[in-house]
């Protein structure tokens, strides 16, 4: 593929950092626009990247920073509500050949009526406002594509991780509890299947979509084909951490009654089996397949955290919540 110019809005998160690295590896010229405050910069960006400081949610700030430049690709990781994408349509119409919106696979019908999930699965998540907002953004962008030819491609990631991210609510606190023998909360019975994707696998497919006219006007999800159960995900992390945890299975509805925000993320996403058909992305990016097994990713996660004590942060709020939930279970299990 020819060298492309790309503007990445965000660029310092779990997914976007990997995408920037992959784009530079392929020889593309990448500009990253953000406020310069991204915490994920601990996985630093390549020196070849041009950095521009601006507030992505302030149209005038972006306009001043870019000065009317044209990019082959604009990829935003910072659009969450329809107002965000309407602002971007006004900013980038006529200034890019492809605008890529990062949506979310959590916007799909929840729970799904059929598995595997395909791109034609309805978008309907009554449990999680975040997901409904992403679906509304998609509707706004596709209307602009139909009405004015705005060159949008929609990408729906599912659970994507990197070495800095323990794939549980509560993060490292869960691993710490595993190692010290405190009860480890597993939502539900742990048997639901969950697709989990390594950040480098996602990035290779994502950058493979750049500059592809066939991808315009389409939504596509990018996920691994590996879908272990939550029990297996917990066990894989525990094995990598050298721990033999005590698990306590807690119904997601019970969790929601104790902590509505945690419960919404479960009932609206992680409590349901999610397996994806990746036929479309493989057709659009024929040389792509996810190659990193979660067993390898789990070892990366533990190694990264163990390399520096400052990374092994225990959140007292999550720790206390897990203790509360564990204490409830004799009542519910009796």
Task: Label the predicted regions.
Residues 208-267, 278, 283-284, 300, ...:
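Mid/C-terminal beta-alpha module of Rossmann-like enzyme folds, strongest
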Residues 154, 190-203, 219, 227-231, ...:
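Conserved loop-to-helix N-cap of the C-terminal "lid" that shapes the substrate pocket in Rossmann-like
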Residues 138-164:
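Conserved beta-loop-beta element that borders a ligand/cofactor-binding pocket
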Residues 6, 12, 39-95, 101, ...:
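NAD(P)H-binding glycine-rich loop region in Rossmannoid oxidoreductase-like domains
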Residues 4-28:
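N-terminal Rossmann NAD(P)H-binding glycine-rich loop of SDR-like oxidoreductase domains
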Residues 168-174, 187-210, 217-218:
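Substrate-positioning beta->alpha
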Residues 104-128, 143-148, 165:
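Active-site "gating" loop of Rossmann-like NAD(P)-dependent oxidoreductase/epimerase domains
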Residues 115-138, 168-172, 195-196, 227, ...:
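Short-chain dehydrogenase/reductase
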């Amino acid at each position: 593929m020819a060298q492309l110019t790309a503007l990445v809005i965000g660029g310092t998160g779990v997914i976007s950092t990997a995408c920037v690295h992959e784009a530079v590896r392929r020889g593309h010229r990448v500009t990253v626009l953000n406020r310069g405050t991204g915490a994920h910069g601990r996985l630093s960006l390549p020196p070849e990247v041009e950095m521009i400081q601006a507030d992505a949610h302030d149209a005038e700030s972006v306009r001043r920073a870019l000065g009317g430049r044209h990019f082959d690709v604009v990829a935003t990781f910072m659009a969450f509500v329809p107002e965000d994408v309407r602002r971007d349509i006004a900013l980038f119409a006529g200034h890019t050949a492809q605008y890529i919106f990062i949506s979310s696979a959590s916007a799909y019908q929840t729970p799904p009526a059929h598995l595997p999930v395909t791109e034609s699965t309805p978008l309907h998540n009554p449990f999680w406002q975040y997901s409904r907002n992403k679906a509304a953004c998609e509707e706004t962008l596709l209307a602009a594509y139909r009405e004015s030819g705005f060159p949008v491609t929609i990408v729906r990631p599912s659970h994507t991780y990197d070495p800095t991210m323990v794939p549980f609510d509560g993060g490292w606190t869960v691993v710490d509890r595993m190692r010290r023998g405190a009860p480890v909360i597993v939502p539900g019975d742990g048997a639901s299947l969950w697709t989990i994707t390594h950040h480098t696998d996602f990035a290779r497919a994502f950058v493979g979509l750049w500059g592809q006219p066939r991808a315009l006007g389409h939504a596509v999800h990018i996920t691994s084909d590996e879908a272990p159960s939550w029990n297996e995900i917990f066990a894989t992390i525990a094995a990598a951490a050298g721990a033999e945890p005590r698990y306590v299975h807690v119904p997601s509805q019970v969790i929601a009654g104790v902590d509505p925000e945690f419960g919404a993320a479960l009932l609206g996403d992680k409590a349901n089996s999610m397996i994806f058909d990746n036929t479309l992305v493989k057709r659009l990016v024929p040389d792509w397949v996810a190659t990193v097994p979660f067993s390898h990713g789990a070892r990366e996660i533990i190694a990264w955290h163990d390399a520096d004590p400052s990374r092994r942060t225990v959140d007292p709020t999550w720790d206390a919540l897990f203790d509360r939930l564990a204490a409830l279970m004799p009542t519910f299990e009796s």
